[in-house]
Amino acid sequence: VTVTIPELGLLSLTDDETNLLNALRAELMSRRFDLELRDCYYNGEQVVRDLGISIPPQLRGLHTVIGWPQIGVDALEQRLDVEAWRYKDAPDDSGELEEIAEANELVAESQLAHLDSLIYGRSYAAVGSGDDDDMPPLISIESPLDMTVFYDARARAVVSGLRLYTIEDQDAAVLYLPDSSIHVVATNSGWEVIDRDDHNLGLPPVVRISNRQRTADRIGRSEITNAVMSITDAACRTLMGMEVAREFYGAPQRYILGAAESAFQDAEGNAKSAWETYLGRVLAFERDEDGEVPTVGQFAAYDPSVYTRIIDMYARIMATQLGLPPHYLGYTTDNPASADAIRSTEAQLVKRAERKQALFSTPWSQVFRLAILIKTGDLPDRSRRIETVWRNPATPTVASQTDAATKLVQAGILPADSDVTLEMVGLTEGQRRRVHADRRRAQGRQALTDLGNELAAARQAARGLDTGPEVADDAAVEGG
C-alpha cells in the first residue's frame, strides 16, 4: 500500500511568495546604505571627507563632530506632539480609540515613528492581533532599516511588506500579504515557514509613514538632505583646520637675529632643546665684538577668528536649509532679539511642523482603521472620520492663547463651556476632561443646592399656611 503525504503549505512558501520575498529583500538592501548614511549624520558618526591639502598625514585621524543635522531634526520633531486620537463627529465617544492608544503607548511610540520618518524619510507601523482575545490589537513601530513595502500610489495603500529580524542568531522575516502574514526563518535550503496567520483582511496590516513625498517619489525623503550633509562636512573640516592651526600656531613663533651659538647652549655647553629655548622666561644675550645686541622678534600670533567667521557663515547657510532660526545653531549677534523677533524667525519652522502634522495624520488614521478591522472584523462608517489631535506647534504663550479665546467668547463666536475654547487656551486632552468633570460636579452641587432651597421654601410656605388662621385670630383678640 502506497501512502501519499500531501505537501503542507505551512512548511514552505509558494513560488510567488518566494519571488515576492526576494524582491522585497533586494529592495530593502538596496536602500540600506543610504539610510545608514543619514543615521550616521544624525548621530554625528559620519566620516568627514578630507580634501588632503591642509591636514598633515599625522593628524588625519583627528575626528571632529558638529551636531547640526541632529539639532535640525530634533527641533522639528519636538513640535510634533500627539495628544489623542478621536472621532471627528463624536469626540466624547472615542473610548475604543483611547483603549488602543493607551494599550500600545502610542503617544510615546508616535515620537519614534516621527523621528525615524524625519531621519530616514519613512517609518512603518505594523498592526496585529493581541496576545489574548480580550486584548486590544498590537501596534508596533518598525525601522526602515529592517522593513520595506511595495506601495500602490493609485490606491494609496500598501500592497505587500517585509520585515527582517533575528531569532537566536538566526535570520528571520515576516512577509505581509493582503490575506496572510507569514513568518519564516532562513535555512540552508531556503526560507522555512514557522507560522502562517491567515487573517483574510484584504490588505497587509502595515502602514508607511512617509516624509517629504512627491508625485514621483512616494517613498519619502529625509530631512538630512545632500545639502545638509555637504555643509556639515564643510563645517567639520573648518573645525579640523582650526584644531590643526591651534597645534601648530597656538604659540607664536619667535626669531632671533645676530645671536651667537652660545645663546642656545646650557651652562655645560650642550645645545638646548627647542622647547627649552622657546619656553624660557628670560632670554639673556651678550653683545658681540662690535657691541651689537641680537635682534629678537615675534611673528603674528594665530587668530582663530578667521575660522569662527567661516563657521558662522556655515551656521547661517545651515539654518536656511533646515528652516531654523540662526540662534538654534549657536549663531548670535551683539543685539539680543526681542520675543516678537524670535517668534518671527520661528515662522518657517512652525509652518513646516504644521505641514508635517497634516501629512502624518493620514497614516495614523489608517493605523487605527486597521486596528479596528482586526479587533471587530468590520469597519464602521465613522472609522473614516478618525482624526489625530496635535499640540499647537507654534508654542504660543498661555496669556496670548487665553486672550484670543476670551475675545472669541465675548464676541459670541464660541461658547464659554465649549471644548474648542479649552483647546484654544492650550489645555491638553487630559486637562480638558478634568475641566469637564469639575464642571459636571459643580453643576451637580449647584443643582442639589437649588433643589434644597426649593424644598426649604416649600416647607416654609406650607408652615405659613398652617399657622395663618391662628395668627389672624390672635391679632383680632389683641385689637379687641
Language-model-detected regions and their locations in the chain:
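Glycine- and charge-rich intrinsically disordered segments
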Residues: V1, E243, R445-G480
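Extended, helix-rich architectural segments
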Residues: V1-I141, D466-G480
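Extended, regular secondary-structure scaffolds
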Residues: Y124-N226
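Extended, charged amphipathic alpha-helical segments
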Residues: I194-S344, I386-V389, T397
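Short, surface-exposed acidic
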Residues: P326-Y331, D378-I386, E423-D438
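Glycine-rich and small/hydrophobic secondary-structure elements
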Residues: T345-L359
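Extended amphipathic alpha-helical segments with heptad-repeat/coiled-coil character used for oligomerization
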Residues: T362, K375-A411
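Long, highly charged low-complexity segments enriched in Glu/Asp and Lys/Arg with interspersed Ser/Thr
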Residues: V425-R459
